């Protein structure tokens, strides 16, 4: 995006974003994501960490948009948030040696789903060359060099994004070029463009803004600390699970069926609907194409509706005086549909994405967090949490 176009877009979209419009903020994220990830990558020299840091920077800015009075101050402010987060990450990882693992992961993220061994070897070599360049340059030169290649080799655009003069950018570019060989610069060009964030990055950040409106603190709670999820994104783990969906879908109905107050039921319905929607935000972390993201969003909408109906229908039946056995039957049907979606539909959608993610990580299994959230055993545990109270209440006590 041209510098003048970016400035005009920020002036137009920032007031809407500050008013709580997630779509407007999503467009801002898309326009600025190259800049923010480049700054983080220049400091950390770790592609996965740079994307995590960039996500948190965007979300912190979203939370504090009310503090911003001039649209022209947004980019400098966002850059400073990013640098502070990246330096915090660097301090917490100062004793961690740089190794080939980060390079392999970065290349895999930029690679096709199934590269040949020859392509993989070439990509790893490009990544190593890029790391060699980054290690030889100061932070400011890394930022400029990364953005220069990501923004189509336009120094004026880089100057606008980093708040520098074009002359200063050209001077630092010249100094950086003098430090490295032309062959390495060509490899760095490939790395810089290949490691740039894609569609899924902006989609994930926009989805995370649903957790809280600007000016509240709940997004910070959901995000947690940098790296706390081992590279699975900054959406947090609490409640984002198929097991929470399964047990939560029944919680509202059970609270009334087992004689608990209606307020608890309404709270459970609200919680499970939000939980289901948030689970889609976590799953979007695995999507790398618009089609994959659309499939996950479709599953999320369907699951949210199913969960709400599973909670609400038994409550309505009881409110209108229907017998408990009928409400329990409706609950059982709803739970069956929820389980079908979680154990049938979701694995079909996620299988190619999980396989690609496993290849990137050099393993054959989904991430531990995903297994804890969406595996058959997790669903079985949540089902037991529903069945046991029913069996106790209506079996042991002999109630009808």
Curated annotation (Swiss-Prot):
UniProt superkingdom: Bacteria
Motif Polymerase core binding location, chain numbering: 62-75
Portion annotated as DNA-binding: 165-184
Pfam families, sorted: Sigma70_r2, Sigma70_r4_2
GO molecular function, a single term: DNA binding
Record keywords, A-Z: DNA-binding, Sigma factor, Transcription, Transcription regulation
InterPro entries: RNA_pol_sigma-70-like (IPR039425), RNA_pol_sigma-70_dom (IPR014284), RNA_pol_sigma70_ECF_CS (IPR000838), RNA_pol_sigma70_r2 (IPR007627), RNA_pol_sigma70_r4_t2 (IPR013249), RNA_pol_sigma_r2 (IPR013325), RNA_pol_sigma_r3/r4-like (IPR013324), WH-like_DNA-bd_sf (IPR036388)
Functional description taken from the UniProt entry: Sigma factors are initiation factors that promote the attachment of RNA polymerase to specific initiation sites and are then released. This sigma factor is involved in lipopolysaccharide biosynthesis and pathogenicity.
Family statement: Belongs to the sigma-70 factor family. ECF subfamily.
Full protein name: Probable RNA polymerase sigma factor RfaY
Species of the source: Xanthomonas campestris pv. campestris (strain ATCC 33913 / DSM 3586 / NCPPB 528 / LMG 568 / P 25)
């Amino acid at each position: 995006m041209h510098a003048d176009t970016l400035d005009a877009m920020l002036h137009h979209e920032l007031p809407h974003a500050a008013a709580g419009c997630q779509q407007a903020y999503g467009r801002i994220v898309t326009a600025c994501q190259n800049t923010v990830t480049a700054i983080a990558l220049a400091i950390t020299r770790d592609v996965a960490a740079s994307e995590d840091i960039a996500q948190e920077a965007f979300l912190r800015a979203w939370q504090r948009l009310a503090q911003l009075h001039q649209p022209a101050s947004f980019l400098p402010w966002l850059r400073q948030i990013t640098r502070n987060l990246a330096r915090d990450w660097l301090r917490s990882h100062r004793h961690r040696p740089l190794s080939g693992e980060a390079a392999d992961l970065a290349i895999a993220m930029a690679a096709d789903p199934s590269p040949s061994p020859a392509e993989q070897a070439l990509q790893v070599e490009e990544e190593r060359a890029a790391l060699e360049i980054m290690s030889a340059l100061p932070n400011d030169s890394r930022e400029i060099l990364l953005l220069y290649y990501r923004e189509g080799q336009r120094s004026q655009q880089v100057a606008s994004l980093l708040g520098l003069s074009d002359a200063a950018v050209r001077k630092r570019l010249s100094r950086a070029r003098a430090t490295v060989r032309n062959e390495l610069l060509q490899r760095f060009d490939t790395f810089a463009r290949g490691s740039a964030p894609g569609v899924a990055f902006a989609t994930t950040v926009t989805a995370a803004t649903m957790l809280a409106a600007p000016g509240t603190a709940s997004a910070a709670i959901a995000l947690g600390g940098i790296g706390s999820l081992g590279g699975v994104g900054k959406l947090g783990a609490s409640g984002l699970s198929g097991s929470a969906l399964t047990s939560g879908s029944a919680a509202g109905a059970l609270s009334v069926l087992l004689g608990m107050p209606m307020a608890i039921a309404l709270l459970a319905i609200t919680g499970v609907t939000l939980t289901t929607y948030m689970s889609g935000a976590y799953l979007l972390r695995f999507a790398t194409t618009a089609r994959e993201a659309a499939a996950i969003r479709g599953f999320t909408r369907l699951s949210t509706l199913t969960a709400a109906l599973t909670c609400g229908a038994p409550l309505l039946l009881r409110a209108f005086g229907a017998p408990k056995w009928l409400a329990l039957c409706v609950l059982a049907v709803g739970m069956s549909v929820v389980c079908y979606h979680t154990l049938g539909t979701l694995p079909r959608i996620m299988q190619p994405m999980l396989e690609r993610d496993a290849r990137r990580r050099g393993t054959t299994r989904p991430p531990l967090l995903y297994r804890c959230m969406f595996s058959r055993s997790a669903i079985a545990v949540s089902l037991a949490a529903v069945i046991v109270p029913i069996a106790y209440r209506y079996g042991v006590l002999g109630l009808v």
